[in-house]
C-alpha cells in the first residue's frame, strides 16, 4: 500500500499515467468553461450587426434588447447631447456596440459638435430626421460634412405624415437622385417609409405603409442599382412591411441588391422578444421587429445572401473588423 507521504494520487488509464490533483482539475475545468463561453453561439447562423438601435433612456435596456434578439453588435443612434452615454455603454460591453451621432440640422453651429463626435469615435451621422427637404440647404450641408469626415449618413425619409408625428421628414424624396449625383463621395444610408414604399413604381404617396403586390420599376429599386454609394437600412415597420407585401418580388430584390442591404431593427420592445412593444401595426404588435425582420430575410434568401445582409455589408461600410 502506498504511503500518503508519496504525494498526490496517481491515475492510470489507457492514455498512460499522470498525476492529477484537485487544484489542477478545477483549474482545467475553469479553463474549459471559459473557452466554451468565449465561443459565440449564433442564433441566426452567424454574427448579426444591427445598424439601427436608438439609445434608450435606460441604456442597459439596449444590451437587453440585443441579447434577447440574438444580435452580436449594434449601432447606437445617439443625439449629440447623449454621446457620453453611448460611449459608457460601449465601454461597459466591449465589442457589442458602436455608435452614430445626430443633431438638429437646422442649426449650423451643430456641425462642430458632430465633427467632434466623429473624431471621438462615432462611425456615422444618423439617424438624421428633421422637418426639412432632402435637397434643402440644411441637408446639403450634412451630405458635405459626411463626405469630409469620411463617414456614412443615415437618413429618415418620410414624405407622408403619420398620425403619431404629423410631420414630413426630409421631404421631396422624388428629387433625391439629384443629391446622389451631386455628392458622389458621400455614402448614403436610406431609411424609413418613403424609401421602402418607393420600391414599387405605383406608390401614390397616400399612405406610409402601402400594401399589395409590388409593381417593378420603383425609384428606390432603380437607385440602389444606379448609385454605388447608396445603401439601404432594413429596419422598422417600413422595411418589414415591404418584406411581407410580395414575397416573390422581394426574393429577387434581396438577390439583386445583396451587397447594398443592411439589417437594422429600430425596435422599441424591451427584451428582444417583443416585450412591451405597442407598435400600432397588428403584424408587429407584441413582437420584436428585429426577430421578425431577421426571420423574414432568412426565409426569403440563401445563406450567402442572408450572411451579407445580417453582417457583412454593414461591417464593410463601417469598417468593422471584429465580430466581438
Where does each model-flagged region fall?
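H/E-rich (His + Asp/Glu) clusters that bind or coordinate divalent metals
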Residues: 2-7, 12-15, 57-60, 195-324
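N-terminal secretory signal peptides and thylakoid transit peptides that target proteins
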Residues: 6-32
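An N-terminally biased module of ancient metal coordination in phosphate/nucleic-acid-related enzymes
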Residues: 25-26, 39-95
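Hydrophobic faces of well-ordered beta-strands that scaffold small-molecule active sites
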Residues: 49-53, 74-76, 99-101, 125-126, ...
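Active-site gating/metal-coordination segments in enzymes
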Residues: 80-171, 231, 236
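Helix C-cap/helix->beta junction micro-motif
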Residues: 93, 148-149, 183-184, 226-227, ...
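Charged helix-capping and loop-helix junction motifs
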Residues: 136-143, 168-174, 213-217, 245-249
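Active-site cradle of extracellular carbohydrate-active enzymes
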Residues: 166, 171-183, 188-201, 219
Amino acid at each position: 500500500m502506498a504511503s500518503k507521504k508519496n504525494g498526490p494520487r496517481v491515475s492510470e488509464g489507457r492514455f498512460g499515467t499522470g498525476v492529477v490533483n484537485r487544484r489542477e482539475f478545477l483549474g482545467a475545468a475553469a479553463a474549459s468553461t471559459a473557452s466554451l463561453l468565449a465561443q459565440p453561439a449564433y442564433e441566426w447562423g452567424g454574427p448579426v450587426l444591427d445598424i439601427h438601435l436608438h439609445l434608450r433612456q435606460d441604456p442597459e435596456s439596449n444590451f437587453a434588447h440585443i441579447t434577447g434578439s440574438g444580435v452580436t453588435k449594434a449601432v447606437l443612434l445617439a443625439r449629440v447631447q447623449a454621446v457620453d452615454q453611448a460611449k459608457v455603454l460601449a465601454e461597459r460591453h466591449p465589442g457589442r456596440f458602436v455608435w452614430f451621432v445626430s443633431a438638429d440640422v437646422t442649426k449650423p453651429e451643430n456641425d462642430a459638435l458632430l465633427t467632434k463626435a466623429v473624431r471621438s469615435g462615432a462611425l456615422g451621422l444618423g439617424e438624421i430626421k428633421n422637418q426639412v427637404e432632402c435637397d434643402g440647404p440644411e441637408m446639403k450641408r450634412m451630405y458635405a460634412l459626411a463626405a469630409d469626415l469620411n463617414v456614412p449618413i443615415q437618413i429618415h425619409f418620410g414624405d407622408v405624415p403619420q398620425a403619431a408625428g404629423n410631420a414630413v421628414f426630409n421631404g421631396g424624396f422624388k428629387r433625391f437622385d439629384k443629391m446622389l449625383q451631386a455628392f458622389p463621395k458621400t455614402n448614403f444610408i436610406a431609411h424609413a417609409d418613403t424609401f421602402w414604399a418607393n420600391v414599387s413604381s405605383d406608390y401614390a404617396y397616400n399612405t406610409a405603409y402601402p400594401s399589395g403586390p409590388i409593381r417593378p420599376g420603383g425609384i428606390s429599386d432603380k437607385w440602389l442599382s444606379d448609385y454605388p454609394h447608396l445603401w439601404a437600412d432594413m429596419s422598422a415597420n417600413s422595411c418589414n412591411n415591404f418584406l411581407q407585401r410580395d414575397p416573390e418580388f422581394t426574393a429577387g430584390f434581396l438577390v439583386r441588391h445583396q451587397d447594398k442591404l443592411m439589417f437594422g431593427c429600430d425596435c422599441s420592445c424591451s427584451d428582444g422578444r417583443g416585450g412591451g412593444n405597442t407598435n400600432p401595426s397588428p403584424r408587429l404588435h407584441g413582437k420584436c421587429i428585429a426577430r421578425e425582420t431577421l426571420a423574414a430575410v432568412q426565409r426569403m434568401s440563401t445563406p450567402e445572401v442572408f450572411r451579407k445582409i445580417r453582417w457583412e455589408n454593414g461591417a464593410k461600410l463601417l469598417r468593422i473588423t471584429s465580430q466581438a
